[in-house]
Amino acid sequence: MNVFWFIPTHGDSRYLGTAEGARAADYDYFRQVAVAADTLGYDGVLLPTGRSCEDAWVVASSLIPATKRLKFLVAIRPGLSSPGLSARMASTFDRLSGGRLLINVVTGGDSAELEGDGLFADHDTRYALTDDFLHIWRKLLAESHENGSVDFDGEHLRAKGGKLLYPPIQHPHPPLWFGGSSPAAHAIAADHIETYLTWGEPPAAVAKKIADIRARAAERGREIRFGIRLHVIVRETEEEAWRDADRLISRLDDDTIARAQQAFAKMDSEGQRRMAALHGGKRGSRQELEIYPNLWAGVGLVRGGAGTALVGNPEQVAARMREYAALGIETFILSGYPHLEESYRFAELVFPLVKGGDARRAGPLSGPFGEVVGNGYLPKVSQS
């Protein structure tokens, strides 16, 4: 089981929908979160993309020297940059980071934002363009290891004599990750992607996605891995966890929720539509927002994209993770508010349950020990 964390380049806070409890989203803070994730034993970090975020490539590049083993899941944007430029960026990053790059292919689901960035294309056209883009991108990086060139004549993109002089460390290219819930998105995943990402829907819905994509990939003679994107609120007791879930949205008012839901409704993203359907745009009670045991839809009231959280004590959260893992999920990309403190909390409480075979995560060897007791004794590993 792989566990990733998240760099909050679109802001961070103790509460959703208010400036109260917010903290500066700057390099010093991003670095703190990245170093924490690296030190605690997370396998990688996701950096979000879009106009609401700092640029993912610039931020990720700045964090390379601050980290030792952490992998970076960074977006390429078909239609907003060329496949050749994106391939060069990926190869350079992979080389400078020592092979620590993962690529998140983001087609985009907000037409207004995309048009603001200069891309005027409907939903299916964007996915057709993504298909052309990935054919060129993959070939450029693969051919770079043999000093080859690429010619491609697609419906939306063409390349003639395309060449990449400096190959990436990873062969044939940094692994491709991708998420999308429409049939067009599933076809892209089956054709090109190494790891398909789903947002945190209930297990039955996730299982249905996995089955469809596996079947499509098998028809093409391919196998695909799967990951899931979730928030997490884990505490020593279930009562504490639900109390903090309620606290996270305690500053939300109906107007803020309505404005957020109106913005999401204008998108043509099937995934965003499915997220919104989980809560219906209404605040509701804890019972109404708990859409499956320990799966809470409160975050999605005002946050676009991933809108559900695992909520509970360590054993409950670990049990839900194992339930998803039994469906085929290998990677969990998690986040929590605020991201620095929650990275420690999750690692301390849940890693011993889901990473028990990994000594680096499972418990103290050379440390950490906690504060020395009585100036001469190390604390016990557990207190009863």
From Swiss-Prot:
Natural source organism: Burkholderia thailandensis (strain ATCC 700388 / DSM 13276 / CCUG 48851 / CIP 106301 / E264)
PANTHER family assigned to the protein according to its UniProt record, in alphabetical order: ALKANESULFONATE MONOOXYGENASE (PTHR42847), ALKANESULFONATE MONOOXYGENASE-RELATED (PTHR42847:SF4)
Role of this protein: Catalyzes the desulfonation of aliphatic sulfonates.
Protein name: Alkanesulfonate monooxygenase
Entry keyword set: Flavoprotein, FMN, Monooxygenase, Oxidoreductase
Taxonomic lineage: Bacteria, Pseudomonadati, Pseudomonadota, Betaproteobacteria, Burkholderiales
UniProt GO BP: alkanesulfonate catabolic process
Keyword match Oxidoreductase: yes
Entry's EC annotation: 1.14.14.5
Pfam family, one: Bac_luciferase
Reaction it catalyzes: an alkanesulfonate + FMNH2 + O2 = an aldehyde + FMN + sulfite + H2O + 2 H(+)
